[in-house]
From Swiss-Prot:
GO BP field: acrosomal vesicle exocytosis; acrosome assembly; endocytosis; establishment of localization in cell; fusion of sperm to egg plasma membrane involved in single fertilization
Gene: Eqtn
Region ranges (Disordered): 110-130, 259-283
Keywords associated with the record: Cytoplasm, Cytoplasmic vesicle, Glycoprotein, Membrane, Nucleus, Phosphoprotein, Signal, Transmembrane, Transmembrane helix
A family per Pfam: Afaf
Function statement: Acrosomal membrane-anchored protein involved in the process of fertilization and in acrosome biogenesis.
Chain segments annotated as coiled-coil in the UniProt record: none
Subunit structure: Interacts with SNAP25.
Signal peptide: 1-20
Protein name, entry field: Equatorin
Tissue: Sperm specific, including germ cells (at protein level).
Residue intervals on the Lumenal side: 21-183
Source domain of life: Eukaryota
Species, as recorded: Mus musculus
InterPro entries: Eqtn/Afaf
Length: 337
């Protein structure tokens, strides 16, 4: 690859060297100026480049693409690069994917006609070649002397804007917007207070009511009836031990529950069997009952209404005594029948 590039470059630059000799030999006695020499060299370069391009095109037509495979390149791309020159010329470079490129130069400047006109472009080219040197020294000298430097128009954007150019309406609008924001914040805070205070009051009231309802529910569950308390409570007599107290309490609670049933059975029997007994037999029975039964205990219950009289309720022992007496009477009356 390097060998091919050397051959191509030698074909490009050798015609330029050959073309320079006849120009100097044609006019040996005449000395050309620098500008005329420059333009003559450029023309010779263009002629040599055109000859080289024709040679390259002929070589492309003759040479095969690849001797080993025998296949030709189908996707060959061509790239063109153009670069402008300071003196007004343009350099365009064309390159392809098969490593073959060519250099072209296009010139826009025209040759001068008079000697006076020849000097002017040379001076202008010299001035334009170094345009920043005098400006740099002037700026540096002014900076050392602490003098104000007149900058370009673009630098004016970095200067501060005078206060007169600013609009006073912007400040008014900003102040109005700040006032509106403050009013909105105050309104929102007041609304939150107005909503939160009633909610707190309602919550405290509901909690207080729930507490009272809970207390009432406990009282209703464990309510005390004085009548039941007097019936269930047992008063032991003197000289009774703890064991007898517990047994008597059990028996008392048992007889309290069954006293009502006994009374109902007694009334039914009295209605179904009317009997006539003599006075002697009744007396004997009563004497026998008084001999082995304990004294009766009577209890008084207060009436629920003021118009009613006091109700005397017999104890469970009296009811048992009456039942036993009734049974004895039935036994005595059965043989007589």
């Amino acid at each position: 690859m390097d060998f091919i590039l050397l051959i191509i470059l030698s074909g490009v630059f050798l015609p330029d060297i050959i073309s320079l000799q006849p120009i100097v030999g044609q006019e040996p006695g005449v000395t050309l100026s620098d500008e005329e020499q420059y333009y003559a060299d450029e023309e010779n370069n263009t002629d040599g480049n055109s000859v080289a391009l024709h040679k390259l095109e002929e070589n492309e037509m003759d040479t095969p693409a690849n001797e080993k495979t025998g296949n030709y390149y189908k996707d060959i791309k061509q790239y063109v690069f153009t670069t402008p020159n300071i003196k007004g010329s343009e350099v365009s470079v064309t390159a392809t994917t098969n490593l073959e490129f060519a250099v072209k130069k296009n010139y826009k400047a025209s040759k001068p006609t008079a000697s006076g006109e020849e000097e002017k472009p040379s001076e202008s080219s010299r001035k334009t070649s170094t345009p920043n040197i005098p400006a740099f020294w002037t700026i540096l000298s002014k900076a050392v002397n602490e003098t104000a430097v007149s900058m370009d128009d673009k630098d004016q954007f970095f200067q501060p804007i005078p206060a007169s150019d600013l609009n006073a309406t912007n400040e008014d609008k900003l102040s109005e917007l700040e006032e509106i924001k403050l009013k909105l914040m105050l309104g929102i805070s007041l609304m939150t207070l107005v909503l939160l205070i009633p909610l707190l009051i309602f919550c405290f009231a509901t909690l207080y009511k729930l507490r009272h309802l809970r207390d009432k529910s406990y009282e209703s569950q464990y309510s005390i009836n004085p009548e039941l308390a007097t019936l269930s409570y047992f008063h032991p007599t003197e000289g009774v031990s703890d064991t007898s107290f517990s047994k008597s309490a059990d028996s008392n609670s048992y007889w309290v529950h069954n006293s009502s049933e006994m009374r109902r059975s007694r009334t039914r029997r009295s209605k179904s069997k009317p009997m006539d007994f003599s006075a002697g037999s009744n007396q004997t029975v009563l004497t026998d009952e008084s001999s082995f039964l304990p004294p009766e205990e009577t209890r008084f219950l207060l009436p629920e209404e003021p118009g009613k009289e006091l109700i005397v309720e017999r104890g469970p022992m009296q009811a048992m005594n009456e039942i036993d007496a009734q049974l004895l009477l039935n036994k005595e009356g059965s043989p007589s029948n």
